[in-house]
From Swiss-Prot:
Annotated disorder: Vesicoureteral reflux 3: A disease belonging to the group of congenital anomalies of the kidney and urinary tract. It is characterized by the reflux of urine from the bladder into the ureters and sometimes into the kidneys, and is a risk factor for urinary tract infections. Primary disease results from a developmental defect of the ureterovesical junction. In combination with intrarenal reflux, the resulting inflammatory reaction may result in renal injury or scarring, also called reflux nephropathy.
One cellular component (GO) term of this entry: transcription regulator complex
Compositional bias annotation for Pro residues: 327-339
Location of the motif 9aaTAD: 361-369
InterPro entries: HMG_box_dom, HMG_box_dom_sf, Sox7/17/18_central, Sox_C, SRY-related_HMG-box_TF-like
Keywords from the named record: Activator, Disease variant, DNA-binding, Nucleus, Transcription, Transcription regulation, Wnt signaling pathway
Source organism per UniProt: Homo sapiens
Name of the molecule in the record: Transcription factor SOX-17
Main location group: nucleus
Tissue distribution of the protein: Expressed in adult heart, lung, spleen, testis, ovary, placenta, fetal lung, and kidney. In normal gastrointestinal tract, it is preferentially expressed in esophagus, stomach and small intestine than in colon and rectum.
GO molecular function terms listed in the Swiss-Prot or TrEMBL record: beta-catenin binding; DNA-binding transcription activator activity, RNA polymerase II-specific; DNA-binding transcription factor activity, RNA polymerase II-specific; RNA polymerase II cis-regulatory region sequence-specific DNA binding; RNA polymerase II-specific DNA-binding transcription factor binding; transcription cis-regulatory region binding
Domain notes: The 9aaTAD motif is a transactivation domain present in a large number of yeast and animal transcription factors.
Biased composition annotated in UniProt, kind: Low complexity: 47-61
Amino acid sequence: MSSPDAGYASDDQSQTQSALPAVMAGLGPCPWAESLSPIGDMKVKGEAPANSGAPAGAAGRAKGESRIRRPMNAFMVWAKDERKRLAQQNPDLHNAELSKMLGKSWKALTLAEKRPFVEEAERLRVQHMQDHPNYKYRPRRRKQVKRLKRVEGGFLHGLAEPQAAALGPEGGRVAMDGLGLQFPEQGFPAGPPLLPPHMGGHYRDCQSLGAPPLDGYPLPTPDTSPLDGVDPDPAFFAAPMPGDCPAAGTYSYAQVSDYAGPPEPPAGPMHPRLGPEPAGPSIPGLLAPPSALHVYYGAMGSPGAGGGRGFQMQPQHQHQHQHQHHPPGPGQPSPPPEALPCRDGTDPSQPAELLGEVDRTEFEQYLHFVCKPEMGLPYQGHDSGVNLPDSHGAISSVVSDASSAVYYCNYPDV
């Protein structure tokens, strides 16, 4: 069944073909006029195979003549006729199977049976040397198609890894689900935020005071943490000593007085006994940062202080000076309050105000306070019978102020 427009299409085509030579004749001889006509198109198509076939055959013959084959060895001489015989006997076998059978048969032959073929191969080799004295064996290069296939395979394999990485978290979620592991949600870290090693223990110790746990909460904003700008000196975030930050409950001095401390150290040049004391050091000397000897022996018990005995509240005073030695810089944010040890909050630049706030009635009570045995200081109980003269009023006031600062730190509700 033909379409109704078929006749029209054929008429238009015939009219165009008949009008084309007239138009070309009016235009005159043009180099491209013959190619536009159907006759010229047929001529070009007919001449192309003829012209292309002749050079192709000549090039093939020249290529075949330029390529020199290697002389056959003894096995090739024997297999040339034997392959034809096996192919006639087994027409259905593949050439690879025939090659396997020929190899087994050649190995099964004895040297006497191989000798005529070896002699024939030697003759062909000598003849080949005479015919082609400058012959040099050049092995064939592998086809570029195989090499391109290998390259494309490796290229596609290399592209598979970026595609797998481009899957994003969804691909990771599928992989984690397949392994039976839990995939973390976006926007939250997979684990608790890391803290410096010298701060992790202090946070864990101070959580017993009732502060909320800090390890499970991420930062609310992408800004830097306030802890990043703090001086990482361990002296600033020193581990709390036993008694600096009590866990809970009220602190009673009766329990401290019942504590059986270590025996009193022997008398010597470094640990003198009780005796007449010289005039005490000045107030700026007590409020200044302690030296190495002051830290170990105390301001009153060090050899440089006159050889006097050390009083009991000196460890607290040393601890306060250590915290005052590393204040946060002006551009650094203050650390969280629960991360700080108990600070006295006193300013050494105002000794007059400190002396005015001291209650002299509390001084004798704090003198009987037991010192820490781990600090290596002399141990004095409440029954040691220590009597200080009234001439040491300034020293007593400073010590009492330091003790009251520690006392009010231990009692935040007072």
